[in-house]
Amino acid sequence: MSSPGRPKGEYRSAQHAGAVAGPPGRPDGEHRGSSGADPNGRLRQACDSLGLRVEAAQADKLLAYLAQMQRWNRTYNLTAIRDPEQMLVQHLFDSLSVVDPLSRVVGADTAATVYDIGSGGGLPGVVLAIMRPTWQIGCVDAVEKKMAFVRQMSGVLALPNLRALHARVEELPPAGCDVVISRAFASLNDFASLAGRHVRNDGTLVAMKGKVPEDEIQTLHQQGEWQVQEIQALQVPALDAQRCLIWMRRSQGTL
């Protein structure tokens, strides 16, 4: 598996203008664009801007997933975001923004194993399963109703590569994943402490964040086992807010 290209123990900080404050660990930004525009057209434009090739069947599944989330959300409170326009941008486009970066590390057509920790309603795990059908995706969450939704999506959307794991991440047996990712789970140190055991020796932890969490990085490095390898700025289509990926690898000499 290739790496983002930074030596262990070092990281590259990406400065990015336009931050909008939001909840700790996953700031919500302001979206731009017309809510009246055709969702299919907007989805294809977003994929184009992200350098993603999306087949018609994949676009249909992405929009069906979003529609099902809106439907389930009325009863099961899968997400605090309820406005369809905000869900399109802050959930779907945000999750799509990590597909290409992950593909560059593990390969787009490999049989990579990826865990999505604290997945909630399947973000970004369901999106990854749709866009990369050869990847084996495990969505992990301690809330049963959210995993019931992901399990339903695996069947409704015909995603045999998607599994829903209703459990606390620390209680699952080690999975030997190529990548373990989280979108709104915990601080970097807590994420590494709880989920790092599921990453194979040369694998990668990836945290989706808003602005660069400098304090969290310092705390992580003080613990010594995991180091930030790279900070990659993301530009989410139609979203005026900072987004970044924090890539982490085990420090030299730790297993």
Swiss-Prot record:
Keywords: Cytoplasm, Methyltransferase, rRNA processing, S-adenosyl-L-methionine, Transferase. PANTHER family: S-ADENOSYL-L-METHIONINE-DEPENDENT METHYLTRANSFERASES SUPERFAMILY PROTEIN (PTHR31760:SF0). S-adenosyl-L-methionine binds at G118, L123, V169, E170, R183. Its EC number is 2.1.1.170. Gene3D superfamilies: Vaccinia Virus protein VP39. Signal peptide: none annotated. It catalyses: guanosine(527) in 16S rRNA + S-adenosyl-L-methionine = N(7)-methylguanosine(527) in 16S rRNA + S-adenosyl-L-homocysteine. It is found in: Cytoplasm. Pfam families: GidB. InterPro entries: rRNA_ssu_MeTfrase_G, SAM-dependent_MTases_sf. Belongs to the methyltransferase superfamily. RNA methyltransferase RsmG family. It comes from Bordetella petrii (strain ATCC BAA-461 / DSM 12804 / CCUG 43448). GO terms for molecular function: rRNA (guanine-N7-)-methyltransferase activity. GO terms for cellular component: cytosol. Coiled coil: none annotated. This is Ribosomal RNA small subunit methyltransferase G. Specifically methylates the N7 position of guanine in position 527 of 16S rRNA. Residues 1-44 are annotated as: Disordered.
